[in-house]
């Protein structure tokens, strides 16, 4: 079931907006200022009908010229107050919205990046980006303007209603009878708008996820000449989002129209009754004029509430989706009272009866009764066919996952007893697929250790045989590598990864096909660099290259999540079996 197809939780309606409070609370001074200026501007607006009443009652004659001058001078003063209060109110609420949005995005991003690897395996990056972008913007629109319009309309409605009662209790009573008729469609239509808003946002997230996947795989799309096909797929996704948006817009339009017709129809009926009272001389014309203006204010406020109600429902839908992300909890966390590794870290590893299956494949064992001891400073190569469990061993060492049975010990300490930053801080990883970020060459190498000096970065690049190609780029170490390292070859990206590991200078080194993208000449140089890097460190190597495997102190052969043989290159060849077969197919051929 996709996110778009998932039913919205029935218990969550406007309650989802409560999640906004922690992001608004730190900026309470802006909220107080906004409320003060809201009250001031609303009060100034409600004064205007009083002046109109006096003008109508006193009439336009030479004898009343002085009074009229005073009234209009007072009106100008009210207008000045209204202008200042409105501008200040807009400033406060808009700034409040921007700050709340920044806090929301910052905390949401910080929460998401701390989730475990399993979460990202079952999530689509494009949808996560949509929630960080589109959904938070919808919420910002509510905080920055929607709430302002809603509360201003509510204050004006209450104020105008109170003044209507004060002006003419009889006419106000007739008006009060029609209010329930107006509120019913607002509530009924509003719930439907919320559901349609959520569906629309889910469809947009699906389209964003599709675009993200396609653009990230642009070379493959072009190689298979799928530009038109992918464009049509994206077009279909956009049309689905448009259909959902069209339904939402239509529902909001009907809501606004129904409310305006009902309210203004009722007000017209009440004013007709007031006009009859004026003709019967039971009501002054000035009083009716004053009541008319207050009724118009109240009607406008009701219309404003009906208009913004759709925004409120849309933001509630967006906040539900954001709340789902905040509700996610990392399955892999640091213990409440972590143990500290003994210093210096030696790098002794012990895998004790490890049993593990991936959450997405619960019926298939990735490792089964896996036992292995690695001595400090030993280099161990893991070899075996695809799916044997080699990369799983590295993933468990990094605590991307925890085994369902057994335990892994580092220097006699269970990995689950260590704080995650401490564990991962003593490990350097050179992955098969190197992540290059949109930054400079120096920044990408410094990813291995943020506080490294320029001299240390330069030394790491030299050791990884990366200095030459970096120096040849325009800008050298300050050259931008482009998103995902599009300006680098596969071998250059791997050398950046090796430089990171060298810079990290960790006691435990994990090499996952670290030289798979290198040509023979570059590999020879890198092998020397890796050999220097491995000295004095416990190293786990996954490789199919003969040179890498041969220099290992021990080779561990895996198949089906189990260890089937161990030994040196020569002894395993002499034994025959799986390793000899792999060597014949991959090394000799």
Give the ranges of each region predicted by the language model.
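Membrane-integrated ABC transporters
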Residues: 1-46, 60-75, 89-93, 97, ...
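Helix-loop-helix
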Residues: 64, 70, 163-177, 247, ...
């Amino acid at each position: 079931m996709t996110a778009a197809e998932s039913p919205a939780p029935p218990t969550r309606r406007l309650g989802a907006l409560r999640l906004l409070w922690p992001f608004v609370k730190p900026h309470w001074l802006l909220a107080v200022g906004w409320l003060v200026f809201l009250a001031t501007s609303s009060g100034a607006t409600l004064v205007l009908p009083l002046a109109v009443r006096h003008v109508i009652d006193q009439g336009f004659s030479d004898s009343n010229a002085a009074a009229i001058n005073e009234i209009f001078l007072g009106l100008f003063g009210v207008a000045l107050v209204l202008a200042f209060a409105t501008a200040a109110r807009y400033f406060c609420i808009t700034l409040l919205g921007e700050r709340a949005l920044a806090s929301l995005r910052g905390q949401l991003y910080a929460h998401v990046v701390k989730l475990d690897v399993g979460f990202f395996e079952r999530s689509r990056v494009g949808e996560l980006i949509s929630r960080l972008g589109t959904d938070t913007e919808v919420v910002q629109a509510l905080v920055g303007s929607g709430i302002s319009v809603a509360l201003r309309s509510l204050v004006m409605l209450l104020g105008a209603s109170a003044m209507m009662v004060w002006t003419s209790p009889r006419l106000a009573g007739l008006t009060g009878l029609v209010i329930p008729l107006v509120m019913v469609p607002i509530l009924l239509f509003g719930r439907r708008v919320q559901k349609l808003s959520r569906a629309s946002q889910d469809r947009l997230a699906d389209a964003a996820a599709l675009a993200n996947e396609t653009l990230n795989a642009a070379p493959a799309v072009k190689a298979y000449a799928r530009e038109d096909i992918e464009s049509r797929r994206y077009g279909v996704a956009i049309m689905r989002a448009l259909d959902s948006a069209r339904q939402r817009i239509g529902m909001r339009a009907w809501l606004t129209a129904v409310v305006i017709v009902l309210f203004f129809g009722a007000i017209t009926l009440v004013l007709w009754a007031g006009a009859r009272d004026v003709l019967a001389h039971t009501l002054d014309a000035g009083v009716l004029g004053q009541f008319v203006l207050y009724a118009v204010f109240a009607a406008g406020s009701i219309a404003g509430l009906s208009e913004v109600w759709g925004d409120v429902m849309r933001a509630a839908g967006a906040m539900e989706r954001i709340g789902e992300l905040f509700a996610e909890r990392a399955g892999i966390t640091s213990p409440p009272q972590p143990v500290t590794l003994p210093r210096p870290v030696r790098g002794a590893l012990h895998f004790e009866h490890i049993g593990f299956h991936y959450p997405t494949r619960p019926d298939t064992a990735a490792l089964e009764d896996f036992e292995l001891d690695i001595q400090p400073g030993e280099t161990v190569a893991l070899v075996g066919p695809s799916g044997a469990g080699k990369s799983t061993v590295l993933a468990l060492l990094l605590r991307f996952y925890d085994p369902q049975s057994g335990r892994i010990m580092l220097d006699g300490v269970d990995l689950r007893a260590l704080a995650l930053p401490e564990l991962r801080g003593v490990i350097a990883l050179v992955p098969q697929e190197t992540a290059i970020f949109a930054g400079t060459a120096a920044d990408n190498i410094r990813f291995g250790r943020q506080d490294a000096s320029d001299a240390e970065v330069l030394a790491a690049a030299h050791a990884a045989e990366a200095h030459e190609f970096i120096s040849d780029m325009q800008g050298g170490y300050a050259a931008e590598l482009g998103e995902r390292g599009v300006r680098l070859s596969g071998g250059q990206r791997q050398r950046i990864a090796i430089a990171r590991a060298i810079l990290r200078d960790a006691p435990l080194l994990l090499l996952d096909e670290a030289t798979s993208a290198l040509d023979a000449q570059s590999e020879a140089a890198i092998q020397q660099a890796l050999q220097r890097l491995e000295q004095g460190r416990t190293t786990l190597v996954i490789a199919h290259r003969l040179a890498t495997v041969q220099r290992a102190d021990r080779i561990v052969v895996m198949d089906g999540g189990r260890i089937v043989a161990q030994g040196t290159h020569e002894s395993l060849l002499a034994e025959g079996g799986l390793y000899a077969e792999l060597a014949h197919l991959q090394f000799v051929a």
